[in-house]
């Protein structure tokens, strides 16, 4: 079964994708890296700075899948054409983002409020776009029972793969992913199905593979940020060593400093990564508080050095 890295705004950018592959290698890399969503410009004029994230030269290694956030099917199809011209084979459509700033515009999982709009959107996409187009979705807006009508629409189109995150929009990321609701979906899907949601350990990956052997893949987001060696461990390899984590985080810090042109901006991005990674270190509670408060690069470097004097927590 294939393992995918989920698209996460502020985390799974090109700096992270390259650094993850460098430090965790073939055994620990994702089979596919889904890039954080981009929105097609309404004037159909591409902004070079925004497209730099998907420049093929900046994305060697494992396949990268661009993700689009849109509500105009024809505009999305045009953008798919632009991405095909860059050499991308598959493009993913985001019908799952639960952020209020997105859903208020009728995009992401906000589109699921009206299945007729989902139908019109996909009609616009598939009438004008060529090649594989996959979809990432939630179960609905208010309750999982909404998914039956939504899936009926998905089944009308040649979607190359359907990634299902079994929460509804209103949940955001609260509560637990609804595995029971997910289990009802694959037998009714006409396309390959990928699972996404609340996967944080190798044991959970293996349990999903055993329970749903027909899945095309499993997509992991926060779990992979919290344990960058997760896929390696699931494939029978070793947990991350302190030396690997040190090199990985140092390269991320330097990469973000170069990308943003500012070590201060890089510190802000690194603090987001440390929110998940700090729990790899035993007894880091006091340093975690310091990490949250600091702002200056020199403060960050001092605290990180202190964190790396601590022992690692034993993985499952």
List each model region and its residues:
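Active-site beta-loop-alpha junctions enriched in small/polar residues
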Residues: 8-10, 38-40, 69-71, 96-98, ...
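Short glycine-enriched, charge-decorated loop/helix-capping segments at active-site entrances
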Residues: 106-112, 171, 235-236
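Alpha/beta catalytic cores of nucleotide-metabolism and tRNA/nucleoside-modifying enzymes
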Residues: 3, 9, 15, 120, ...
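N-terminal small/glycine-rich loop or linker at the start of catalytic domains
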Residues: 1-2, 41-63, 97, 102-105, ...
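Hydrophobic faces of well-ordered beta-strands that scaffold small-molecule active sites
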Residues: 3-6, 33-35, 64-68, 91-93, ...
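Flexible, glycine- and charge-enriched loops at secondary-structure boundaries
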Residues: 111-115, 175, 239-242
């Amino acid at each position: 079964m294939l393992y995918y890295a989920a698209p996460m705004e502020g985390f799974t950018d090109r700096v992270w994708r390259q650094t993850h592959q460098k430090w965790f290698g073939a055994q620990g890399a994702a089979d596919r890296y889904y890039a954080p969503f981009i929105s097609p410009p309404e004037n159909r004029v591409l902004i070079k700075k925004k497209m730099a994230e998907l420049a093929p030269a900046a994305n060697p290694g494992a396949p990268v899948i661009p993700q689009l956030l849109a509500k105009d099917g024809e505009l999305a199809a045009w953008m798919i054409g632009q991405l095909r011209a860059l050499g991308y084979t598959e493009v993913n459509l985001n019908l799952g983002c639960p952020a209020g700033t997105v859903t208020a515009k009728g995009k992401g999982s906000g589109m699921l409020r009206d299945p007729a709009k989902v139908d019109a959107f996909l009609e616009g996409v598939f009438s004008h776009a060529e090649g594989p187009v996959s979809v990432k979705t939630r179960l609905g807006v208010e309750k999982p029972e909404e998914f039956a009508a939504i899936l009926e629409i998905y089944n009308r189109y040649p979607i190359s793969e359907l990634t299902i995150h079994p929460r509804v929009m209103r949940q955001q990321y609260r509560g637990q992913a609804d595995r029971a609701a997910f289990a009802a979906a694959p037998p009714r899907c006409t396309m390959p199905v990928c699972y996404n949601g609340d996967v944080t350990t190798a044991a959970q990956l293996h349990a999903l593979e055993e329970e749903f052997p027909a899945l095309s893949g499993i997509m992991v987001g926060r779990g992979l940020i919290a344990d960058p060696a997760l896929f390696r461990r699931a494939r029978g390899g070793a947990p991350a060593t302190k030396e690997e984590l040190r090199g990985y985080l140092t390269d991320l810090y330097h990469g973000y400093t170069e990308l943003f042109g500012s070590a201060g901006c890089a510190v802000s991005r690194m603090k987001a990564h440390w929110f998940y990674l700090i729990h790899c270190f035993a007894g880091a509670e006091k340093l975690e508080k310091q990490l949250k408060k600091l702002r200056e690069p020199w403060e960050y470097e001092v605290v990180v050095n202190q964190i790396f004097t601590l022992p690692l927590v034993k993985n499952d």
